[in-house]
């Protein structure tokens, strides 16, 4: 078999990967490919460690978090390994270095006083959007889980809320066509399916 570019391999990889992952996961992969990998490496037949290291440092200098850059490299490695498996390219593991963070950001959380203020405001100025925020603040549900709730998930007599789905807006890129879609899915992990006391 002949060599292929990373762009050509990514097309075949997407077709291969699609049946095995959720639509939202595939949309995230495509977004990473289109926005980061293909503009930088799409026409390459192979990738050397130094080119990838320079790419990593450039992305971080331009404001991406280390985690976001690592996510990009995960997708890049999947494409590269798929290319090797099909004998379209050579690939050797890279030893990529990430700059250590100069300052660790402290996680900002809502104070108890502000939590109470928000709940009181929602109670005094009812709206359905406010109700969603209220449920989230009182139960710890993620916003996608709150938006995916149905009346059948709420058991008033038992005082529980059953969580077994989430809703998210995903960005779809299909050739030149780009749009967003709302997708209802199961939560990311099995432990996310749960029953919560009200």
Q: Across the structure, where does each feature detected by a protein language model lie?
A:
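N-terminal alpha-helical segment
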Residues: 9-10, 48-52, 114, 128-129
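Basic, Lys/Arg- and aromatic-enriched nucleic-acid-binding interface segment
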Residues: 66, 70, 85-143, 147-149, ...
